[in-house]
Amino acid sequence: MSKKLHIKTWGCQMNEYDSSKMADLLDEYEGYTLTDNAEEADVLLLNTCSIREKAQEKVFHQLGRWKTLKDKKPGLIIGVGGCVASQEGKAIKERAQCVDLIFGPQTLHRLPEMIDQIKDGKKAVIDVSFPEVEKFDRLPEPRAEGPSAFVSIMEGCSKYCSFCVVPYTRGEEVSRPLDDVILEIAQLAEQGVREVNLLGQNVNAYRGATHDDEICTFAELLRYVAAIDGIDRLRFTTSHPIEFTQDIIDVYEDTPELVSFLHLPVQSGSDLILTQMKRGHMAIEYKSIIRRLRKARPDILISSDFIIGFPGESKQDFADTMKLIEDIQFDHSFSFIYSARPGTPAADLPDNVSLDEKKERLAILQDRITQQAMRYSRQMVGTVQRILVEGPSVKNPMELRGRTENSRVVNFEGLHEHIGKFVDVEIVDVYTNSLRGVFIRGEDEMDLRRDLRPSDITAKYKQADDLGVTLFTPA
């Protein structure tokens, strides 16, 4: 009988990616198969997030429920990974004796050895070190699960925003070598993946080593990935404004595979609050990036993160944020009430904004952005949109579900053979969380590929001066 593995994942898309790699790793290691039922599992893994308030308490509440399972099944192995594990380390074991494994985001590749040690009688294994990109060298080959895939290209962040725990829980920025990234994406493309989302805590800070000991910039990487046969749609998340350089913007001008949608967190529209957050830029600099982006790609839509009620946020500061939202006309946002994260500089600032005021401001902000998003959706009615068909519709399995470049779900009537492919649909109706489309044409009627090699694309923009320094010039 096969061994069963249950993974509960909280947090960002990077955690989702890590959890999928854990599952692949343990399947290859000893044939563990995933189960949604924790009660039938032989190994329980909790992949945690420390961004939100009371993250630690949430972990211990879950472990309390799992302890009941272990009392009934003494051989059950329980592991805690992710950012809370990295932050708390052995304190987790001291408070929850049922835990066998504690591992950080950078050491998940050591899970097989950790499990072996527990089976050999060791009481607990704790490894929350930061061995840079070693984990990627030890993970099994990628497995596609549908036409879209996430690929991690870097780990950590070196920006040290005053409110953020990422540099402390995932380490500083470390980029994967270019060849490793390209190989993983090419393997996914061979399995039918058509859309790739490049992941990183600060993805546009990517600086990956090449085979000849040069450095590949993020803009170059985008061009390389866009040239991989079979990859016809390209996304990335999450970016930082101070790393959003002109060469990245230039890619939007001539690379149709790169979608007309960008998530670029700003957090606040107040220069005073941005300074307190140690974001490294002002609101006008953010607006300048968006202005240049829209010049390169006029139809691009922008989403952002916002923190509401940061210590010292006055009514004027919030008004500045709302003014920025009006100026940019964001399509979507991930917005949260500020909660202090232990160990961060902002945790020492006086939190002088009342909870009621925070809630009111959050509601105002979310209502405004929802209105803007609905306006964009209505503007799509009557247009023809290219969507990647992901599978049957959630509400009506007799229909199909696809996603537009700007991440809107479209339900339409179509043939099963379209799943995993691109189709063009006319948008005919708008709902709160989806659009309605009518099938226009299939992939066999489209011209999706350009007859270019990766080197042809990058050579157009790359040149070296007399000193051998690589330069990029706009198209």
Swiss-Prot record:
* InterPro entries, alphabetized: Elp3/MiaA/NifB-like_rSAM, Methylthiotransferase, Methylthiotransferase_CS, Methylthiotransferase_N, Methylthiotransferase_N_sf, MiaB_methiolase, rSAM, rSAM_horseshoe
Q: How is the cofactor bound?
A: Binds 2 [4Fe-4S] clusters. One cluster is coordinated with 3 cysteines and an exchangeable S-adenosyl-L-methionine.
Residues bound to [4Fe-4S] cluster 2: C157, C161, C164
Which residue ranges does the record assign to the Radical SAM core domain? 143-375
Which cofactors does this protein require? [4Fe-4S] cluster
GO MF terms held by the record: 4 iron, 4 sulfur cluster binding; metal ion binding; N6-isopentenyladenosine methylthiotransferase activity
Show where the TRAM domain sits. 378-441
The cross-references to SUPFAM superfamilies, in alphabetical order and at most eight, read:
Radical SAM enzymes
Cellular compartments annotated: Cytoplasm
Q: Which domain of life is it from?
A: Bacteria
Q: Enumerate the spans annotated as MTTase N-terminal domain.
A: 3-120
Coiled-coil intervals, chain numbering: none
Please tell me where this protein is predominantly located: cytoplasm
Q: What class of enzyme is it?
A: transferase
**CDD domains to which the protein is assigned, alphabetical:** Radical_SAM
Give one Pfam hit by family name: TRAM
Positions that bind [4Fe-4S] cluster 1: C12, C49, C83
- What Enzyme Commission number(s) appear in the record? 2.8.4.3
Name the chemical reaction catalysed here.
Answer: N(6)-dimethylallyladenosine(37) in tRNA + (sulfur carrier)-SH + AH2 + 2 S-adenosyl-L-methionine = 2-methylsulfanyl-N(6)-dimethylallyladenosine(37) in tRNA + (sulfur carrier)-H + 5'-deoxyadenosine + L-methionine + A + S-adenosyl-L-homocysteine + 2 H(+)
Instruction: Provide this UniProt record's keywords sorted from A to Z.
Output: 4Fe-4S, Cytoplasm, Iron, Iron-sulfur, Metal-binding, S-adenosyl-L-methionine, Transferase, tRNA processing
Classification via HAMAP family:
tRNA_metthiotr_MiaB (MF_01864)
The record's subunit annotation is: Monomer.
Family membership noted in the UniProt record: Belongs to the methylthiotransferase family. MiaB subfamily.
Query: What's this chain's function?
Result: Catalyzes the methylthiolation of N6-(dimethylallyl)adenosine (i(6)A), leading to the formation of 2-methylthio-N6-(dimethylallyl)adenosine (ms(2)i(6)A) at position 37 in tRNAs that read codons beginning with uridine.
Name of the protein in its database record: tRNA-2-methylthio-N(6)-dimethylallyladenosine synthase
What organism is this sequence from? Shewanella pealeana (strain ATCC 700345 / ANG-SQ1)
